[in-house]
Amino acid sequence: MLMSWSPEECKGQGEPLDDRHPLCARLVEKPSRGSEEHLKSGPGPIVTRTASGPALAFWQAVLAGDVGCVSRILADSSTGLAPDSVFDTSDPERWRDFRFNIRALRLWSLTYEEELTTPLHVAASRGHTEVLRLLLRRRARPDSAPGGRTALHEACAAGHTACVHVLLVAGADPNIADQDGKRPLHLCRGPGTLECAELLLRFGARVDGRSEEEEETPLHVAARLGHVELADLLLRRGACPDARNAEGWTPLLAACDVRCQSITDAEATTARCLQLCSLLLSAGADADAADQDKQRPLHLACRRGHAAVVELLLSCGVSANTMDYGGHTPLHCALQGPAAALAQSPEHVVRALLNHGAVRVWPGALPKVLERWSTCPRTIEVLMNTYSVVQLPEEAVGLVTPETLQKHQRFYSSLFALVRQPRSLQHLSRCALRSHLEGSLPQALPRLPLPPRLLRYLQLDFEGVLY
């Protein structure tokens, strides 16, 4: 239920209705950081919500990209409008009850948040190239940033290549940081921004320019967003594949941490992640680089369920048993991953780790694993096939829901029938051979003169039943 108070209810006894505490008045009128530059050099910003006359017509013409109207208004000196006129797009009405909010709701806000922009920024963000050219011809400053961002930041974020080119030709700084410490190249992140990045690099943008707080390079951003083409461009232009941000993350760590947004895009996400990781590794990235928490690419790929990436990293020789700062191995990460990893074949991740010498799950933790992954019987199957005995308590059947038992009846019937019972001789032989070759399984198994079917059996091929 929404609650509201009228000014009469909130004002103190004997105080006039429109009275405002001097401190509140100073706080409300305090300029924001982004407005300081403009307030030092010209009149106050035009509030778009209350604008009228030529100011309103100018604002609407810029929004619409009407270059003729913009030109006519700027040609009329009596309007007092200029190419660098600053507009405030915030809503000042929300601050009128500022004093009453403080007193009745105990809410505090130290500054009046202005949202400042210029016609140049609006034209750049909306792709109005001709308006942009007109404003620049009339001496609009390309690096003006009353709201904390330049027009070049806006054009790059929106992916307007033509606007980016116009601004760069006009002298816009390709390495300037915005209020968040990000440079234009950091904002080339969406579809259609590859050409913007190429232009920035051609006009002198630093390929490894770092953001001010996170200390991230553009390659970190491309890797985190799964932008394969941009990562390829940056690497070809000399980006460092092992650059570290403030938390010690390399682009490879960021790439391995790419998450699927839904079950339906899991396969496509893993495919992009694999492309990125292959690209970074071929450029010389360290496959075993650790961050400040000792997390390695393998930990993150396992946690996100990227089976193909796990296989790639293991083929590079990284250890399947390295622990992070919290004592988690890659196998722990795979089994503790989010539920979305179910769509990304966790059984393939688990099998790859076990076939590369990962230490098995402690038997006492198997009931918890069964409860967590009961809807994915292949994951349970591959884990149980590394033991000579099914080490589950007899009451473990209660950990699986009746619906899951019914759906996977054949597998779970075979599983619970083997609790504390001897396994088949064939399975025991597999366990003995794998134990004998422990530490060299990936190299030794393919070299054995065995039929393909038997080789797959030794490599824990899925059968859908336990013997």
From Swiss-Prot:
Q: Mutating residue 97 to E leads to what result?
A: In GLC1F; uncertain significance
Q: Which superkingdom? A: Eukaryota
Q: What is the effect of changing residue 295 to L?
A: In GLC1F; uncertain significance
* Effect recorded for residue 360 to H: In GLC1F; uncertain significance
Q: Which Pfam families match?
A: Ank, Ank_2, SOCS_box
Where it sits in the cell: the answer is: Cytoplasm; Nucleus
Which effect does the record note for changing residue 72 to H?
In GLC1F; uncertain significance
Q: Which tissues is this protein detected in according to the database?
A: Expressed in the eye. The highest expression is observed in the iris, with moderate levels in the trabecular meshwork (TM), the lamina, and the optic nerve; slightly lower levels in the ciliary body, retina, and choroid; and very low levels in the lens.
> Mind telling me which InterPro entries this protein's record contains?
Ankyrin-SOCS_Box, Ankyrin_rpt, Ankyrin_rpt-contain_sf, SOCS_box, SOCS_box-like_dom_sf
Q: Where is the SOCS box domain?
A: 412-464
Asked if the keyword Nucleus belongs to this entry, the reply reads: yes
Task: Tell me the impact of changing residue 67 to M.
Answer: In GLC1F; uncertain significance
Residue ranges of ANK repeats? 115-144, 147-176, 180-209, 214-243, 247-289, 293-322, 326-361
Q: Which UniProt keywords apply?
A: ANK repeat, Cytoplasm, Disease variant, Glaucoma, Nucleus, Repeat, Ubl conjugation pathway
The main location class comes to cytoplasm
- One GO process term, biological-process aspect: intracellular signal transduction
Is Repeat a UniProt keyword of this protein?
yes
Functional pathway: Protein modification; protein ubiquitination
**Which family does the similarity line name?**
Belongs to the ankyrin SOCS box (ASB) family.
User: What is this protein for, i.e. what is its function?
Assistant: May be a substrate-recognition component of a SCF-like ECS (Elongin-Cullin-SOCS-box protein) E3 ubiquitin-protein ligase complex which mediates the ubiquitination and subsequent proteasomal degradation of target proteins.
The disorder on record is: Glaucoma 1, open angle, F: A form of primary open angle glaucoma (POAG). POAG is characterized by a specific pattern of optic nerve and visual field defects. The angle of the anterior chamber of the eye is open, and usually the intraocular pressure is increased. However, glaucoma can occur at any intraocular pressure. The disease is generally asymptomatic until the late stages, by which time significant and irreversible optic nerve damage has already taken place.
Instruction: Please state what the annotation says regarding this protein's domains.
Output: The SOCS box domain mediates the interaction with the Elongin BC complex, an adapter module in different E3 ubiquitin-protein ligase complexes.
User: Mind telling me what this protein is named?
Assistant: Ankyrin repeat and SOCS box protein 10
Species of origin: Homo sapiens
